[in-house]
Amino acid sequence: PFQSMATTQQNIELRIIQTSDVHGCFFPYDFIERKPKEGTMARVITYVDSLRNIYGDRLLLLDNGDILQGQPTCYYSNFVNPQQPNIAASVINYMKYDAQTIGNHDVETGHAVYDKWIKETKCPMLGANVTNTHTNTPYLKPYAIFNRAGVKIAVLGMLTPAIPNWLNESLWSGLRFEEMVSCAKKWMAIIQRDEKPDIVIGLFHSGKDGGIHTEQYDEDASI
Protein backbone atom coordinates (compact mmCIF):
# COMPACT_ATOMS: atom_id res chain seq x y z
CA PRO A 1 0.00 0.00 0.00
CA PHE A 2 1.05 3.59 -0.54
CA GLN A 3 1.45 5.91 2.42
CA SER A 4 -0.97 8.60 1.41
CA MET A 5 -0.57 12.31 2.08
CA ALA A 6 -3.11 11.90 4.85
CA THR A 7 -2.25 10.21 8.13
CA THR A 8 -3.95 6.91 7.28
CA GLN A 9 -2.55 4.10 5.17
CA GLN A 10 -4.57 2.64 2.34
CA ASN A 11 -4.32 0.74 -0.93
CA ILE A 12 -4.58 3.08 -3.91
CA GLU A 13 -4.93 1.71 -7.44
CA LEU A 14 -3.54 3.99 -10.13
CA ARG A 15 -3.80 3.52 -13.89
CA ILE A 16 -0.93 4.84 -15.99
CA ILE A 17 -1.48 5.04 -19.76
CA GLN A 18 1.43 5.95 -22.03
CA THR A 19 1.54 6.51 -25.78
CA SER A 20 4.70 6.87 -27.83
CA ASP A 21 5.76 7.36 -31.45
CA VAL A 22 2.29 8.38 -32.58
CA HIS A 23 3.85 9.94 -35.70
CA GLY A 24 0.79 11.91 -36.67
CA CYS A 25 -1.63 8.98 -36.53
CA PHE A 26 -4.49 10.97 -35.09
CA PHE A 27 -7.32 9.72 -37.31
CA PRO A 28 -8.31 6.12 -38.17
CA TYR A 29 -7.17 6.60 -41.76
CA ASP A 30 -3.74 6.35 -43.39
CA PHE A 31 -3.50 9.35 -45.71
CA ILE A 32 -0.29 7.99 -47.25
CA GLU A 33 -1.60 4.50 -48.08
CA ARG A 34 -5.14 5.85 -48.53
CA LYS A 35 -6.84 3.18 -46.48
CA PRO A 36 -8.32 2.78 -42.97
CA LYS A 37 -5.76 2.49 -40.20
CA GLU A 38 -5.91 0.52 -36.97
CA GLY A 39 -4.98 2.12 -33.69
CA THR A 40 -4.59 5.92 -33.87
CA MET A 41 -5.45 8.53 -31.29
CA ALA A 42 -9.11 8.48 -32.34
CA ARG A 43 -9.35 5.00 -30.85
CA VAL A 44 -7.01 5.67 -27.95
CA ILE A 45 -9.30 8.43 -26.65
CA THR A 46 -12.25 6.00 -26.59
CA TYR A 47 -10.20 3.59 -24.48
CA VAL A 48 -8.88 6.34 -22.20
CA ASP A 49 -12.33 7.82 -21.64
CA SER A 50 -13.68 4.41 -20.64
CA LEU A 51 -10.91 4.11 -18.05
CA ARG A 52 -11.45 7.64 -16.79
CA ASN A 53 -15.02 6.67 -16.00
CA ILE A 54 -13.58 3.99 -13.70
CA TYR A 55 -10.46 5.60 -12.26
CA GLY A 56 -11.23 9.31 -12.39
CA ASP A 57 -8.18 11.35 -11.39
CA ARG A 58 -6.34 8.14 -10.48
CA LEU A 59 -5.53 7.81 -14.19
CA LEU A 60 -2.36 9.43 -15.51
CA LEU A 61 -2.06 9.91 -19.29
CA LEU A 62 1.46 10.41 -20.68
CA ASP A 63 3.00 10.70 -24.14
CA ASN A 64 6.62 9.84 -24.87
CA GLY A 65 7.32 11.94 -27.95
CA ASP A 66 7.70 11.57 -31.73
CA ILE A 67 4.25 12.90 -32.52
CA LEU A 68 5.02 15.82 -34.87
CA GLN A 69 5.92 13.82 -38.01
CA GLY A 70 4.53 10.89 -39.97
CA GLN A 71 1.22 11.71 -41.65
CA PRO A 72 0.43 14.48 -44.17
CA THR A 73 -1.82 16.11 -41.57
CA CYS A 74 1.31 16.87 -39.55
CA TYR A 75 3.24 18.21 -42.54
CA TYR A 76 0.35 20.50 -43.42
CA SER A 77 0.09 21.80 -39.86
CA ASN A 78 3.85 22.15 -39.40
CA PHE A 79 4.84 23.79 -42.67
CA VAL A 80 1.88 24.69 -44.91
CA ASN A 81 -0.45 26.32 -42.40
CA PRO A 82 1.63 27.04 -39.28
CA GLN A 83 -0.49 30.10 -38.50
CA GLN A 84 -3.16 27.83 -37.01
CA PRO A 85 -2.67 25.88 -33.76
CA ASN A 86 -0.47 22.85 -34.32
CA ILE A 87 -2.63 19.77 -34.77
CA ALA A 88 -0.43 17.69 -32.44
CA ALA A 89 -0.93 20.24 -29.66
CA SER A 90 -4.67 20.34 -30.34
CA VAL A 91 -4.93 16.55 -30.06
CA ILE A 92 -2.87 16.39 -26.86
CA ASN A 93 -4.96 19.17 -25.34
CA TYR A 94 -8.26 17.60 -26.41
CA MET A 95 -7.28 14.25 -24.89
CA LYS A 96 -6.17 16.01 -21.69
CA TYR A 97 -2.71 14.51 -21.41
CA ASP A 98 -0.99 15.06 -18.09
CA ALA A 99 2.59 15.28 -19.40
CA GLN A 100 4.63 14.69 -22.51
CA THR A 101 8.25 14.34 -23.62
CA ILE A 102 9.81 15.52 -26.84
CA GLY A 103 11.35 12.98 -29.25
CA ASN A 104 14.11 13.11 -31.82
CA HIS A 105 11.62 13.21 -34.71
CA ASP A 106 9.95 16.19 -33.05
CA VAL A 107 13.30 17.99 -32.96
CA GLU A 108 13.74 17.13 -36.63
CA THR A 109 10.95 19.56 -37.56
CA GLY A 110 13.13 22.51 -36.49
CA HIS A 111 12.90 25.22 -33.86
CA ALA A 112 10.08 27.19 -35.48
CA VAL A 113 7.77 24.16 -35.44
CA TYR A 114 8.57 22.50 -32.13
CA ASP A 115 8.94 25.71 -30.14
CA LYS A 116 5.45 26.76 -31.26
CA TRP A 117 4.08 23.28 -30.52
CA ILE A 118 5.59 23.31 -27.02
CA LYS A 119 3.97 26.68 -26.27
CA GLU A 120 0.58 25.51 -27.53
CA THR A 121 0.59 22.25 -25.57
CA LYS A 122 -1.16 22.75 -22.23
CA CYS A 123 0.44 19.85 -20.35
CA PRO A 124 4.08 20.01 -19.16
CA MET A 125 6.62 19.22 -21.89
CA LEU A 126 9.44 17.36 -20.15
CA GLY A 127 13.11 17.03 -21.03
CA ALA A 128 15.48 17.12 -18.07
CA ASN A 129 18.56 16.53 -20.21
CA VAL A 130 17.88 19.33 -22.72
CA THR A 131 19.87 22.44 -21.81
CA ASN A 132 19.76 25.96 -23.25
CA THR A 133 23.40 26.64 -24.09
CA HIS A 134 22.90 30.42 -23.97
CA THR A 135 21.65 30.43 -20.37
CA ASN A 136 22.87 27.01 -19.18
CA THR A 137 19.38 26.36 -17.82
CA PRO A 138 16.83 23.64 -18.67
CA TYR A 139 15.22 24.24 -22.05
CA LEU A 140 12.22 22.17 -21.03
CA LYS A 141 10.61 21.40 -17.70
CA PRO A 142 12.69 18.59 -16.12
CA TYR A 143 9.86 16.94 -14.23
CA ALA A 144 6.23 17.29 -13.22
CA ILE A 145 4.46 16.53 -9.95
CA PHE A 146 0.95 15.10 -9.63
CA ASN A 147 -1.11 14.40 -6.52
CA ARG A 148 -3.66 11.69 -7.18
CA ALA A 149 -5.84 10.23 -4.43
CA GLY A 150 -3.26 11.16 -1.83
CA VAL A 151 -0.34 9.68 -3.80
CA LYS A 152 2.42 12.06 -4.86
CA ILE A 153 3.80 11.16 -8.29
CA ALA A 154 6.89 12.59 -9.97
CA VAL A 155 7.36 12.17 -13.73
CA LEU A 156 10.93 12.72 -14.93
CA GLY A 157 11.30 13.20 -18.68
CA MET A 158 14.36 12.79 -20.90
CA LEU A 159 15.15 12.06 -24.53
CA THR A 160 17.98 10.43 -26.41
CA PRO A 161 21.18 12.52 -26.40
CA ALA A 162 22.16 10.96 -29.74
CA ILE A 163 20.34 13.71 -31.64
CA PRO A 164 23.60 15.44 -32.72
CA ASN A 165 24.59 12.16 -34.40
CA TRP A 166 21.43 12.13 -36.51
CA LEU A 167 20.29 15.70 -37.10
CA ASN A 168 21.86 18.83 -38.54
CA GLU A 169 22.76 21.38 -35.87
CA SER A 170 20.51 23.98 -37.48
CA LEU A 171 17.55 21.98 -36.18
CA TRP A 172 18.68 22.05 -32.54
CA SER A 173 20.91 25.13 -32.37
CA GLY A 174 21.37 26.50 -28.88
CA LEU A 175 20.63 23.15 -27.24
CA ARG A 176 22.75 20.54 -25.48
CA PHE A 177 21.59 16.98 -24.84
CA GLU A 178 23.10 15.55 -21.68
CA GLU A 179 23.94 11.91 -21.03
CA MET A 180 20.91 10.25 -19.48
CA VAL A 181 22.30 8.32 -16.50
CA SER A 182 24.21 11.20 -14.93
CA CYS A 183 21.31 13.56 -15.67
CA ALA A 184 18.83 11.18 -14.04
CA LYS A 185 20.99 10.89 -10.93
CA LYS A 186 21.21 14.68 -10.67
CA TRP A 187 17.47 15.26 -11.02
CA MET A 188 16.47 12.29 -8.88
CA ALA A 189 18.45 13.80 -6.01
CA ILE A 190 16.61 17.10 -6.51
CA ILE A 191 13.21 15.40 -6.77
CA GLN A 192 13.77 13.30 -3.66
CA ARG A 193 15.02 16.29 -1.69
CA ASP A 194 12.45 18.87 -2.78
CA GLU A 195 9.35 16.83 -3.62
CA LYS A 196 9.58 13.57 -1.61
CA PRO A 197 7.28 11.67 -4.00
CA ASP A 198 5.69 8.29 -3.35
CA ILE A 199 6.32 7.20 -6.95
CA VAL A 200 8.76 8.30 -9.65
CA ILE A 201 7.97 7.54 -13.30
CA GLY A 202 10.70 7.77 -15.93
CA LEU A 203 9.34 9.01 -19.26
CA PHE A 204 12.35 8.53 -21.54
CA HIS A 205 12.32 8.83 -25.32
CA SER A 206 15.19 6.43 -25.86
CA GLY A 207 15.39 2.91 -27.18
CA LYS A 208 17.22 -0.39 -27.07
CA ASP A 209 20.01 -1.33 -29.49
CA GLY A 210 20.04 2.07 -31.14
CA GLY A 211 23.44 1.40 -32.67
CA ILE A 212 25.32 4.14 -30.82
CA HIS A 213 27.56 3.18 -27.91
CA THR A 214 30.34 5.52 -26.80
CA GLU A 215 31.98 6.47 -23.52
CA GLN A 216 29.60 9.43 -23.36
CA TYR A 217 26.44 7.73 -24.55
CA ASP A 218 24.66 4.38 -24.45
CA GLU A 219 21.37 3.99 -26.30
CA ASP A 220 20.28 1.38 -23.74
CA ALA A 221 20.65 3.84 -20.86
CA SER A 222 16.92 4.04 -20.22
CA ILE A 223 16.83 0.28 -19.59
Where is each model-derived feature located?
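Acidic, metal/ion-coordinating pockets
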Residues: 2-223
